[in-house]
Amino acid sequence: MSDNKIYLCAISNIESGTCNEDCKFCTQSVKYKADIERYRRKEIEDIVNEAKKARANKAVGFCLVTAGTGLDDKRLDYVCRAADAVHKAVPDISLIACNGIASYEQLKELKKHGIENYNHNLETAREFYNEICTTHSWDDRYETCLNAKKAGLYLCTGGIFGLGETQENRISMLKSIASLEPMSVPINFFHPNDALPLVKNPLTKQEAFDLVKLARSYLPNQMLMIAGGRELMFGEEQYDVFKHGANALVVGDYLTTGGRDAQDDIDAVTALGYEIAFACHQ
């Protein structure tokens, strides 16, 4: 990857707010009654239109995200049909799926339908995971990441800072991510919501910048993507993340929160002298 290239990725929340897990950081859990938009299936035509818009906004990747524990037969079929439609309409965008815990066989099926990359975040350290989720295990998540690689998919796995974890937890998570040798690593910062058990993100802006730098030290060759919580965490200094080692951004809206206008990101990145990457594998 070129030192001067910045990679942009967009996400589509194709099934929202229907998850029965108890992840304390996530408004998509039905357990917390957060005031978000909830729906079972987004129309595939709408997903295709979002993909077209994402590519027009210079995104090289487009992620199909479903709320829920993992893939069942109906959800797998839906994601595959969506992938087929997007691939046909926007063949030059790299397709990513983020559908929770998945088996090797399910991931092979996604690959058959044009999915190139599977996103499944470790979220935090193994030893801290029970503090933020009790309905599935960290080991379940790690195994899914291994399954994705075994199925021949590129792996995208990262985590969230600001959940109350210790510095030792952060280092442990980064070491675990590095052990998986992913292609890309999304770094999220907890976005508080009054409905969630986690009350606030204790990180300062400087601590967050230092964590980006720390992540890069453990992941020297990966696409390091700043994702959820970027605007809230960094404000007007958000593009300084590149000085600390990041080389990718999620553009547009996030799963349940609004993002910055994509053109504003493009203008800011190019004004700093960076080049927007045209493909994931440059």
UniProtKB/Swiss-Prot annotation:
Entry note: cofactor: Binds 1 [4Fe-4S] cluster. The cluster is coordinated with 3 cysteines and an exchangeable S-adenosyl-L-methionine.
Cofactor(s) of this protein: [4Fe-4S] cluster; [2Fe-2S] cluster
Keywords of the record: 2Fe-2S, 4Fe-4S, Biotin biosynthesis, Iron, Iron-sulfur, Metal-binding, S-adenosyl-L-methionine, Transferase
SMART domains: BATS (SM00876), Elp3 (SM00729)
Top EC group: transferase
Reaction catalysis annotation: (4R,5S)-dethiobiotin + (sulfur carrier)-SH + 2 reduced [2Fe-2S]-[ferredoxin] + 2 S-adenosyl-L-methionine = (sulfur carrier)-H + biotin + 2 5'-deoxyadenosine + 2 L-methionine + 2 oxidized [2Fe-2S]-[ferredoxin]
Pathway per the UniProt entry: Cofactor biosynthesis; biotin biosynthesis; biotin from 7,8-diaminononanoate: step 2/2
Binding site for [4Fe-4S] cluster: 19, 23, 26
EC number: 2.8.1.6
Domain Radical SAM core intervals: 1-230
GO biological process: biotin biosynthetic process
HAMAP family: BioB (MF_01694)
Similarity-based family: Belongs to the radical SAM superfamily. Biotin synthase family.
Quaternary context: Homodimer.
Function noted in UniProt: Catalyzes the conversion of dethiobiotin (DTB) to biotin by the insertion of a sulfur atom into dethiobiotin via a radical-based mechanism.
Protein name (Swiss-Prot/TrEMBL): Biotin synthase
